[in-house]
C-alpha cells in the first residue's frame, strides 16, 4: 500500500467538467521523466498524498511517472484528487512496435492524460509534428486528454522566430483533433528546460496570449478561452507564483522539482488563484 486509509480523498470531477468549468482553475503537473524506482515512488507518494495542500479544489494536480510505475501509481492515487499522466504514447493502437506503449493500453490502466511532443521527445528522439498530431489524436480517441508541448530553441528565440515555430507546431500538432476536442497546451521554451533559466513573466504572457489567439483561429474563441495553457521550464517554488500571475498562464508543467514531494508541494502552495 502506498497510503494509509485516512489519507484517501474523494476524487475530483471528471476531465470534461474540469476543462469546461470556470477558468480560474490552475493545473500543476509533475513530470518525473526517467526517474524513480517503485520503492522511491512509494516513499514520494506516502508523503505527498498526506498533505493538506492538495485539498484546494481550484488547483488540479497530476503526476507523470515513467511507464513502469503507472499501474502502481494509479492504485495509489485512485482515491485522491491526483490525476495520472503518461510521458508519451504511440500513435497506433497495437502492432509490431517493440518497446512502444499505445493509448488504449494507457487508458486501460487508468491514465487520464498524456504528454505529446515534450521537448526531449522532439530533440532527443526526433519526433516530428506530423507524428505528434497522430499521437494527440490517438489520445483523444482512447478517452485521454493530450497535453501538446511546444517550444522554441535558444537559437530560434534569439533570431525572432519564436512565433513562427510555435504557429507551425500548433497548426500541425492539433490538425488531427476533432473540432470540439478538449486538450491542454504546454509552452516549454527548450532553452529553459533543465537549465535553470526561466522565461521572464512578460515573455511568458506574450507567448501564451499568442498561443491562445492561434487556438482561436484553428478552432474557436470558446475553445481557446477554455483550453488550459501551462508553462514549463525550470519551474521552482521561487518563481511559481510570478508565473502563475500571468493572465494567460493556467498552470505549470514541472520537471526536476517535482521529484521531491517537499519541493513539488512548495510549488503547488505558491500558485496564485484569482
UniProtKB/Swiss-Prot annotation:
Domain of life according to the entry: Bacteria
Single GO BP term: glyceraldehyde-3-phosphate biosynthetic process
Binding site for substrate: 31-33, 194, 234, 255-256
EC numbers on record: 5.3.1.1
Keyword set, alphabetical order: Cytoplasm, Gluconeogenesis, Glycolysis, Isomerase
Pfam families: TIM
Catalytic residue positions: 118 (electrophile), 188 (proton acceptor)
UniProt GO molecular function: triose-phosphate isomerase activity
A GO term from the CC aspect: cytosol
Protein's cellular compartments: Cytoplasm
Reaction catalysis annotation: D-glyceraldehyde 3-phosphate = dihydroxyacetone phosphate
Enzyme class: isomerase
Pathway given in the UniProt record: Carbohydrate biosynthesis; gluconeogenesis; Carbohydrate degradation; glycolysis; D-glyceraldehyde 3-phosphate from glycerone phosphate: step 1/1
Database matches in InterPro entries: Aldolase_TIM, TIM_sf, TrioseP_Isoase_bac/euk, Triosephosphate_isomerase, Triosephosphate_isomerase_AS
UniProt subunit comment: Homodimer.
UniProt family annotation: Belongs to the triosephosphate isomerase family.
Chain's role: Involved in the gluconeogenesis. Catalyzes stereospecifically the conversion of dihydroxyacetone phosphate (DHAP) to D-glyceraldehyde-3-phosphate (G3P).
The protein's name in its UniProt record: Triosephosphate isomerase
Natural source organism: Chlamydia trachomatis serovar L2 (strain ATCC VR-902B / DSM 19102 / 434/Bu)
